Structures are given as structure tokens and as C-alpha cells.
A protein has these predicted regions:
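Conserved alpha/beta-domain cores
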Residues: 112, 119-125, 130-140, 144-148, ...
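N-terminal beta-alpha lobe that positions the nucleotide/phosphoryl donor
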Residues: 1-191, 200, 289-300, 305-308, ...
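Long, charged amphipathic helices and adjacent flexible linkers at domain junctions
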Residues: 73-76, 84-87, 108, 180-181, ...
Length: 802
């Protein structure tokens, strides 16, 4: 504390507060003061004032409560949920019945009069700020109360007393014991802040790192209509946005990924009549269908919020958890709170456990995955707080949503499952802190699951978390994230699922040797590209399906390009600035047929593996427009988002004529190799997977900047084996290490090296056979692209050879 105010001051304006005042006004209020006084003018933070810890202690001392509370808590067993509830209610009753000391009440009235001015109907938020809250090693996660839409000094005084009492909520008492804080060293400051009219706009939470992987190069923003409490509490499934910090800094289009939330309800101010009748300050109402089907923020809003987030993170020098609101009257964005992120940022640099299911089962429910672990146990459905004591250690806690009152029992669960909520909701925050998996926003988990059923809760498969029937076997491995020894070639990764890219990129790697579009098309789009292009001239059922998936986008075609671009950009941003080689779509006709509408457009083929795929498809009149959408997505990611680390790979190029035509089409769509006058270092590579590619390697290289060996297809076509056959009689003959296959690979490597062009491999072979990887290194291959789970072992084995 400095001479900005006196140690005995009871009330302090936010403008006079700094982060050094945490012991005086708690982390929340100190942070507000710091931002108002120290951040650039462009970052808007609503002003207000705070009562001090000294004021709180004087308040308790005034009524002799200090000693009474201490004695009441001295013998309390916080594991006894009912005893905890009785003690908490008793203490809160004492505090709310206690009058303010005259000097404290006068100070509050004076500060409020100055803040409100002539606007007698102005709305304020009355928030708690515990003096141990928001320290980097502990998240108090909203344990004390917040009151919104408080109007007039009498209501402010009343709510302040409730805020003081909330220091002794059941969850707060339990949490202090769990974290080792003595009750009497934690005091409470009440902050009174001018309200942003986000009830007429939108609000949410953002983190300056990815909440699941800890990846630090993105800002993660959640948003929903109305007051932000619905997002914080987990009452809605919000919209989600990822912003790439390097692109933001470079002035490029930085929003790399969006997920449309259901946003079923919103919280708004109660009317004066409702307040008079029920005393409620806010109410929840259903969101209109039209509003649900569009994003609650524009890309421009998201970009501005991300700029604020980066400024705040740089000021504090650590990852931050930030609440924001968009005022529906003036259209401006405001920062409402900022606190240190308390989970992932403290795990940086540590060896991590990676969980993997060894089996599969019936999916009973699914939602947003929180964390990357797997939990098993019996289902325990809890409908309300009165049933909390039914949760036993190791249970799977299943409920509609959680709030801070649930925390005493959440730590008993082996996993948490909720109907509602997004990645920044209360259940998600506490699950991360406790280190247990959670699946939130399932919609109907309390209906789909039954008490006592043994289930597996898996958060190890990307953004989506699954609840499987039965206890599935799980494999747990330690993942190294440190420096690896130097070897004479590059170890890259095969990545199909963009949702795992932020995690994979933190493992040792030299980039991505194969980024597949098939996962993005299958999981993020799900519709055949020709059904998208033929819309609206398609049958009614297909039309409804297309309209359903394309919600929130300008058109079905825009949806297809947007989702492709977002998936590609997520992988490219994760590994930036290392190279990411994106293979154009390589579905076979039987795989395209499985997409919505696919059966209407795909031919019947006896052996799709040898049929209408790869370059043959792109250059055909039937698929030309669909190919154009892929090119548009790639161009957007490279040019507009500035992710020029993307390189393009063309699969299954059978003939030199196809090579000429497909590279010409790419150029026509604005994707020109740098060696042919293109910009930003674009390289176009071909898959070497047809024997003709190796036999005529020198001629094919006239059209491409290198080759990547697809050992799966090259093996089947060299040996005449159908890898989709399924016949055990043939399985033992399928081996990339066969001398004929090796001869093809050697020829391709030699041709590329002779011309100084890239040569890598991205097939399954090196992942399955370590000796094959060693042979490739001896042959002079430039890079080996592996499945992520084999990267470290292969790297270390190659390094050990010297």
C-alpha cells in the first residue's frame, strides 16, 4: 500500500487501487483498479469503489462476531455436508442481522453518491472480492456472491451485507479447508461497479490460453446473449471462438475457429414490477430461435476482445481468465473482471499423462470434453443440492448444472457430467482444478443415464467428450515435452483431428507431414459437397439437413468453406511457424457416400480404393466446383489469416497429364507455387503412392516441389494387395518392408535428392515398424511423419544409433 489511501480507510475508489492492494481489497477489486489506472485508454473497464478488509474486520468486531465465528468453525467437520450446511447458515444469519458501524455506512453512502451522480436509476453490480481470491495458485471460482442490477443506496447496503455473509457459504468454508487457508486470515471486500448493459447485448468469459491443452498462442472466447452469469454458471452452451495471437499481432484475420452454441436462454434485468413483487433483480428468458441460430458476436467484436485480452496478459505477465460484456445501448465492449488462470498455466513444462481408450462401447451421451483424462465409476444423478450427500467417492456425478454450492461433493467424483454449460462454466473450472474429467453441455445426460450404471467418461478424443456404457480399459502413458536430441532428419506428425492439434504441437516435432481434410469434412461438415452446391435445388429432407448444419453462416457454401478453413487454420496455428503439409481431400466414393446426401452423388464401384479418388476427382467436371471450395479455404487460411506455413499436397496422381492439369487448376484458383511466381513460399507436394510416381519420379517433379511417400497405397499397388480386403490370408503379405516396395521408395528418394526437392514419408509404416524408420533414415529421407503416440519413441531410437 502507498499514500494513495490510508491503512484505516474503509472505502477506496477503484482508480486508487493497484494489484499491490490484494490484501486490502482482494484480487478482484485490486485487479479492476489496476486495469482502470494502468491499461491503455482503449481498454474499457467500468468504474466503482470497494470496501476494505479493514472495514470487513471492523464490521465483524463491531458486533462481537469475530470470536463467535471462530468458535463455531473450530470443531466443524467439513466432510459432514449436513453439519456444514447448519453451521454456514447460522453464521450467515448473524452477519446479515448485524448493523453497519456508523462510520462505515457513512463512507459507503458517500462513495455511492459520487459514483451514481444524478442518475438515481443507474444499475450496479455488487461483487465479492476475497483477500485470498484469484491468487495464481488457487481459484475461488465465484464462491462468494455477486448481485446484478442493484439500484439505489438502500439496496446496495443490503446486498453488501449479503456479500459479507457469503464468505461463510458452505462451499467457501469447505474450499478454504481443502486449500489450507485459515478462516480468520481471509477477509472480504465488497466492490460496487457500474453495470454494463449486456442484458441488451452479450457477455462471456475469455482465457489467454487454450483451457484444455494450455496452448499459449490463442485467446479462447465464449459468448452468449444477456448477462454473463449464464456463461459463468454453465446455464447455457455458449458460442466459442479461438483467436490466433501471432495473426492478431500481424494484423491478419485472426479468428481461426468458431463453434455455434445453442444459447437457449439469456439473463436480463427484472422489471421494476418483478423486483417489487419477488425481490428478484434478474430473470432468465428463452432466446429466440433466430438468435440461437446466429453467433452472438461478430468476428470484429471477437478480434477486439482478443486485443484487450493480449494487452491484459502482457500487463500481468501471465495467462489470464477475463470476464467481459458488450453493452447493448452503446455497442462497446467492456472488461468486467480479470484474474490469473489457475490450472493449465501451472502445469507448463511438466511431463503429462496421456489417456487412451483400449476398447469401445455404446455411447450413452456426449458433450464438450473438459480436460483430457478418462474416469470410470457408477452413475450418481443429483437433481438438486439436497441430494448432494448421496455422492460417494468414485461416483460419476451427473446433474443439470453445478454452481459453487456443489463444490464440497465435486471433489469426491471420478468424473462430472452436466446437461448444460460450456468450457468456461463453473463445472469445467472446478473439474480442471481437481484434475478430473468432465463432459458438459450434454443436453439430456440426466435422462440418458441411470443411477448405478457403470460408465466410462472419456475426454481423450478431442473437443467432444463421450460417456460409454461399461468400464472400458484405459492406457495411460507419460508424454515428454522437453528438448529432444538432434538427429539427421525431421520428425513430423500426422494430424487429422484439429481439436487435438493444440495438444500435439507441444510434443517434440518439426511440423506436420500430413494434415488430413477427411476428419474435418466428416466431423465438422458432415454433408457431401455437391449437396451443398446444389442447395436449394435438392429434396426437402436433404434441404433441412443442409440448413441445420449451416446455421450461423451466410450460406451453405460459405459454411463448407468456413468449416474447412477453420479446421485447416487450427492445425496451422497450432504448429506455426513450422510447416504444415495439408493433403487435399482423399475420400474414396464409398467414404463420400457416407456423408449426408452422399448416396445421391457417388458412383457404385467394385473397388473404390482404385477408383474415383485423388487427382482424378479434382480434374473431373463432376467435382470441379467442390474442388474449388477446398482451394478457397486454403487460400483464405494462407492469405487472409497469414498462415503461410501451409503447404499443399495432392494425393493419388496417376499420370503426368493429371499432374499438369491439377497444378494448373490450383494455379487458376490462386494457389501458385513460389517457384512459378507464387507468393509467401507456397510449395505444392505430391503423394508418391502409385508405382508410376516412383518410376517416373523425375518427370513428376517438374510439376511439384517434392514428394511424400504414402507407404500404405504404394505397398498395396506394388504388391497387388487390396488393403481393404480384410482377408487374413493376404494380411501377412502386406508389408512396407518388402524389397519391391523398398525399391520404389529408394527410387523416389534418390530422384528428389538429385533435384534438391523435399522428400518425406507420411504412411503408417514408420509408426508400426521402427526398423523401417531406421532404413528410411539411412536412405536419406528428409522427414518422417508419424502418428503422435510414436513420435518420442521413434525419435529416441534414431538418436540412439548415433
Amino acid at each position: 500500500m502507498t499514500n494513495r489511501f490510508e491503512p484505516t480507510d474503509l472505502v477506496v475508489p477503484f482508480e486508487q487501487l493497484r494489484m499491490s492492494d490484494v490484501e486490502v481489497v482482494g484480487g478482484k477489486n485490486a485487479s479492476l483498479g489496476e486495469m482502470i489506472s494502468q491499461l491503455p485508454n482503449g481498454v474499457r473497464v467500468p468504474t466503482g469503489f470497494a470496501t476494505t478488509a479493514h472495514a470487513f474486520r471492523e464490521f465483524l468486531k463491531h458486533g462481537g462476531l469475530t470470536e463467535r465465528i471462530s468458535q463455531r468453525l473450530a470443531t466443524l467437520d467439513t466432510e459432514d455436508v449436513r453439519a456444514l450446511a447448519v453451521a454456514g447458515a447460522e453464521i450467515r444469519g448473524w452477519i446479515e442481522a448485524q448493523p453497519f458501524p456508523a462510520d462505515l455506512e457513512a463512507a459507503i453512502r458517500g462513495a455511492f453518491a459520487k459514483l451514481a451522480g444524478d442518475n438515481l436509476q443507474a444499475s450496479f453490480a455488487v461483487r465479492s472480492s476475497a483477500t485470498a481470491e484469484d491468487l495464481p495458485d488457487a481459484s475461488f471460482a465465484g464462491q462468494q456472491e455477486t448481485f446484478l442490477n442493484v439500484v439505489g443506496i438502500e439496496d446496495v447496503l443490503h446486498k453488501m451485507k449479503e456479500v459479507f455473509a457469503s464468505l461463510y457459504n458452505d462451499r467457501a468454508i469447505s474450499y478454504r479447508v481443502h486449500k489450507g487457508f485459515a478462516h480468520d486470515v481471509v477477509a472480504l471486500s465488497a466492490g460496487v461497479q457500474r453495470m454494463v448493459r449486456s442484458d441488451l447485448g452479450a457477455a462471456g468469459v475469455m482465457f489467454t490460453i487454450d483451457t484444455e491443452s494450455g496452448f499459449s498462442d490463442v485467446v479462447f472466447v465464449t459468448s452468449s446473449y444477456g448477462l454473463g452469469e449464464t456463461v459463468v454458471q454453465g446455464a447455457v452452451n455458449p458460442d466459442e471462438f479461438y483467436v490466433h495471437k501471432p495473426a492478431l499481432k500481424a494484423g491478419k484475420q485472426a479468428v481461426i475457429r468458431r463453434n455455434l452454441g445453442s444459447k437457449l436462454i439469456k439473463m436480463e434485468f427484472a422489471t421494476p414490477e418483478e423486483k417489487a413483487a419477488s425481490g428478484k433483480l434478474v430473470r432468465t428468458v428463452d432466446t429466440t430461435v433466430e438468435a440461437r441460430n446466429r453467433y452472438s458476436l461478430t468476428n470484429e467484436d471477437v478480434t477486439e476482445l482478443a486485443r484487450y485480452a493480449v494487452i491484459i496478459e502482457e500487463h500481468y505477465g501471465r495467462p489470464m481468465d477475463i470476464e467481459w460484456g458488450k453493452d447493448g445501448t452503446d455497442g462497446h465492449l467492456y472488461i468486467l473482471q480479470a484474474r490469473p488462470e489457475t490450472v493449465k498455466s501451472q502445469q507448463q513444462g511438466k511431463a503429462e499423462q496421456r489417456y487412451k481408450l483400449k476398447g469401445t462401447g455404446t455411447v450413452l451421451a456426449e458433450g464438450r470434453a473438459i480436460g483430457q483424462k478418462i474416469g470410470t465409476g457408477p452413475v450418481r444423478i443429483v437433481h438438486n443440492i439436497s441430494e448432494m450427500d448421496t455422492v460417494k467417492p468414485g461416483d460419476i456425478l451427473v446433474t443439470d448444472m453445478t454452481d459453487p454450492n456443489w463444490e464440497p461433493v465435486m471433489k469426491r467424483a471420478s468424473a462430472i457430467v452436466t446437461n448444460r454449460g460450456g468450457r468456461t462454466c463453473h463445472a469445467a473450472i472446478i473439474a480442471r482444478e481437481l484434475g478430473i474429467p468432465a463432459v458438459v453441455g450434454c443436453g439430456n445426460a440426466t435422462e440418458r443415464l441411470s443411477n448405478g450404471t457403470l460408465v466410462t467418461v472419456a475426454c481423450s478424443e478431442g473437443d467432444t467428450g463421450y460417456i460409454y456404457e461399461g468400464l472400458l480399459e484405459t492406457e495411460v502413458t507419460e508424454v515428454t515435452r522437453g528438448e529432444m536430441p538432434h538427429i539427421g532428419l525431421k520428425i513430423m506428425m500426422n494430424v487429422g483431428n484439429p481439436q487435438l492439434a493444440f495438444d500435439f504441437c507441444q510434443m517434440p516435432n518439426s511440423g506436420v507431414g500430413l494434415a488430413r481434410l477427411e476428419f474435418i469434412i466428416n466431423n465438422n461438415i458432415g454433408v457431401h459437397p455437391k449437396a451443398i452446391l446444389d442447395y436449394p435445388n435438392i429434396d426437402s429432407d436433404l434441404k433441412k439437413a443442409v440448413e441445420s448444419v449451416a446455421r450461423g453462416h451466410a450460406s451453405p457454401r460459405a459454411f463448407y468453406v468456413d468449416k474447412l478453413a477453420e479446421g485447416i487454420a487450427t492445425i496451422a496455428a497450432a504448429f506455426w511457424p513450422k510447416p504444415v503439409i495439408v493433403r487435399l481431400s482423399d475420400f474414396k466414393s464409398n467414404e463420400y457416400k457416407k456423408l449426408i446426401g452422399g448416396s445421391r452423388y457417388e458412383p457404385e464401384e467394385e473397388n473404390p480404393m482404385l477408383g474415383f479418388r485423388g487427382a482424378s476427382r479434382y480434374i473431373s467436371a463432376e467435382f470441379g466446383e467442390a474442388f474449388a471450395m477446398e482451394c478457397e479455404a486454403l487460400k483464405r487460411v494462407r492469405n487472409d489469416m497469414g498462415l503461410s506455413n501451409i503447404e499443399i499436397m495432392v494425393p493419388f496422381v496417376r499420370t503426368l497429364k493429371q499432374a499438369e492439369r491439377v497444378t494448373g487448376m490450383l494455379a487458376d484458383h490462386g494457389l501458385v507455387r513460389e517457384s512459378q511466381g507464387g507468393k509467401d513460399g507456397l510449395r505444392i507436394i505430391m503423394m508418391c503412392e502409385v508405382p508410376s510416381n516412383a518410376i517416373l519420379a523425375e518427370q513428376f517433379l517438374a510439376y511439384f516441389d517434392g514428394m511424400s511417400i504414402g507407404s500404405n497405397d504404394l505397398t498395396q499397388l506394388t504388391l497387388g494387395l487390396d488393403r481393404d480386403s480384410g482377408l487374413e490370408l493376404l494380411a501377412h503379405d502386406f508389408d512396407e518392408r518388402d524389397p519391391a516396395v523398398k525399391a520404389m521408395i529408394s527410387r523416389a528418394i534418390a530422384a528428389c535428392r538429385a533435384q534438391g526437392k523435399y522428400i518425406g514419408i507420411c504412411g503408417q509404416g514408420p509408426s508400426d515398424h521402427p526398423d523401417f524408420a531406421e532404413w528410411l533414415a539411412d536412405e536419406g529421407i528428409v522427414s518422417i511423419s508419424l502418428n503422435p503416440d510414436t513420435v518420442v519413441d521413434t525419435w529416441q531410437r534414431l538418436a540412439a544409433r548415433g
